[in-house]
Design a protein with these regions (language model features):
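A short, acidic, amphipathic alpha-helical segment used as a generic capping/interface helix at domain edges
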Residues: 150, 320-333
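A contiguous pocket-lining binding segment that forms or flanks enzyme active sites
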Residues: 278-311, 317
Length: 374
């Protein structure tokens, strides 16, 4: 169904969410209709933030907000749903629009499989009534479901529309770009060159896919890399855990701006721990590129200042490959925690592949390699 008609059925004037490729039609519609507007549309750091922000909107207006998200974000909403929204607490009504990755019976990437299996069960456990929208679902069926949901919403309960792949359509094309000339895949190529045989923990999305293909192109082993294919926002904490246990080995984390924002508190712990053998690189294109390109707030904030305030003893931002190479060499030689922000353009190769090894194989090979490290 057309996303414009879906929005009319929802009849909401405030949306907040974390972008999802399954919801690209809705995301593009919201950007085309509202852009980023605190009164009507906010892209928040994580799904729990969205839920709290939407709760504040309801408290101020008495109206019902919409929170959109990928099903991988269900874990982030459990706490505010259970201890803030629930009708045994504050009874705050909300409409969740959830992209269903990893739906049973439909091929998807490994990080989505289990989440897809438990998506509906988690909603049931949270007491959230849901309606699944597929390609063949009619507007009349969605409208009837929304009308039925009004009873729950009027009682301060929460409801959800679970969106299958291709269920929503939007004809208007929205392009996302910035003026940064550097290309993420080339940035990662430079990191691989500088890091040598040091272990790398890479963030979810296209960065890990590009790292995998660079190793393939170079004829190098994948044992050096832990590809954090899911678990968005946690790669730096994984890298910290490795670095603390392997103090004689330089550990590199290749992170993204959307991931850093999602769980930014990890930077405070990382800076306070200050492992001398870790390099934290954030490739900042100011966008959730892997799921469509919608903007993050990272273009508006000073990540270097944040890193410094969190206790990183060395923090820099680079905008050219020459600057990047210089800082990578310095980080390699330095016995101190280093933070490098790399300003990056939006975009990737059309033929970018996916890892051909399984997640378990990746883990086993990485762990075997770490046994050789000090």
């Amino acid at each position: 169904m057309k996303v414009e008609n879906f929005a009319k059925i929802l009849n909401a004037d405030f949306y907040t969410g974390v972008p999802d490729s399954q919801l690209k039609a809705l995301c593009n519609y919201l950007m085309h209709t509202y852009g980023i507007d605190p009164k009507h549309h906010v892209i928040a750091a994580n799904e729990g933030n969205c839920t709290a922000l939407a709760a504040g909107y309801h408290l101020a207006t008495g109206k019902v907000p919409v929170v959109y998200m990928q099903n991988s974000g269900e874990g982030n909403i459990i706490n505010p749903v259970a201890s803030l929204l629930n009708d045994k607490v504050y009874a705050i009504p909300m409409i969740f629009v959830i992209g269903w990755r990893g739906e049973p019976g439909i091929h998807d990437e490994p990080q989505h499989i289990y989440q897809g299996e438990v998506t509906l069960k988690l909603l049931e456990d949270m007491g959230i009534r849901y309606f699944v929208i597929g390609k063949d679902t009619t507007e009349e069926e969605v409208s009837a479901a929304m009308q039925d949901f009004r009873k729950e919403l009027d009682c301060g309960e929460d409801v959800a529309f679970v969106i299958r792949k291709g269920a929503l359509s939007y004809e208007e094309k929205v392009e996302y770009r910035n003026d940064n000339p550097m290309i993420r895949e080339e940035i990662i190529r430079h990191i691989v060159q500088a890091s040598g045989e040091d272990p790398i923990v890479s963030t979810t999305g296209k960065a890990s896919r590009e790292l995998f293909e660079i190793r393939e192109h170079n004829g190098q082993s994948h044992k050096y890399d832990f590809l954090t294919v899911g678990s968005m926002g946690h790669s730096s904490s994984i890298a910290l855990g490795v670095a603390v246990q392997k103090p004689g080995t330089k550990v590199w984390c290749v992170d993204g701006d959307g991931a850093v924002l999602m769980h930014m508190g990890s930077m405070a712990v990382l800076g306070s721990t200050a492992p001398e053998n870790m390099v934290h690189i954030v490739i900042n294109n100011g966008a959730h590129e892997t799921v469509g390109g919608m903007p993050t707030v990272a273009a508006n904030i000073d990540l270097v200042a944040i890193a410094g305030a969190c206790g990183y003893p060395n923090a820099v931002s680079v905008t050219t490959y020459e600057e990047l190479d210089r800082e990578l060499v310095a980080a390699k030689e330095r016995d101190a925690l280093t933070f490098i922000e790399v300003k990056c353009g939006i975009g990737a190769r059309e033929d970018l592949g996916r890892p051909t090894t399984t997640a378990l194989e990746n883990k086993q090979n990485f762990m075997e390699y770490l046994k050789e490290c000090r």
